């Protein structure tokens, strides 16, 4: 790949299983040559609160870091767990990226139409990581928009 594309990876981070899955997906994308921003890689919440001296300061710092990463990214890859449903943060990130006219690719194993209108029509949906990677590697998605 000649251009190192930047991907913002939006996904739930509620528990260790989510974080392990997110890490695995980020590694797969990086192995294909993409630069991946994964919010959970900031570090542990307790360590960050200690570093910045409080919860409010830490929350503002994380928000600004994530917002800056979305602005720099060429696209968003979002993961939606059908069993747990989407996270509010992930949906916000998808909407922000879509509003910036950046492509949003939704990885939703077991995807079925009719689950949620906005994520489905505001993104390109994939049901396997392999199909997502194949599409990313074949498409020149920089500057493209999702067609409805």
Task: Give the residues covered by each predicted segment.
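Conserved catalytic or regulatory cores that recognize and/or transform ribose-phosphate-containing ligands
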Residues: 1-148
């Amino acid at each position: 790949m000649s251009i190192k594309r930047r991907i913002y990876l939006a996904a739930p981070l509620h528990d260790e299983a989510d974080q392990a899955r997110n890490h695995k997906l980020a590694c797969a994308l990086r192995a294909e040559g993409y630069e991946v921003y994964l919010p959970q890689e900031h570090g542990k919440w307790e360590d960050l609160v200690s570093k910045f001296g409080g919860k409010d300061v830490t929350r503002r710092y994380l928000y600004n870091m994530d917002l800056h990463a979305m602005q720099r990214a060429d696209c968003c890859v979002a993961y939606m767990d059908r069993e747990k449903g989407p996270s509010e943060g992930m949906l916000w990130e998808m909407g922000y990226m879509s509003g910036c006219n950046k492509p949003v690719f939704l990885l939703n194993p077991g995807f079925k139409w009719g689950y949620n209108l906005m994520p489905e029509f505001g993104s390109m949906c994939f049901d396997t990581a392999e199909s997502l990677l194949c599409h990313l590697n074949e498409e020149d998605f920089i500057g493209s928009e999702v067609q409805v």
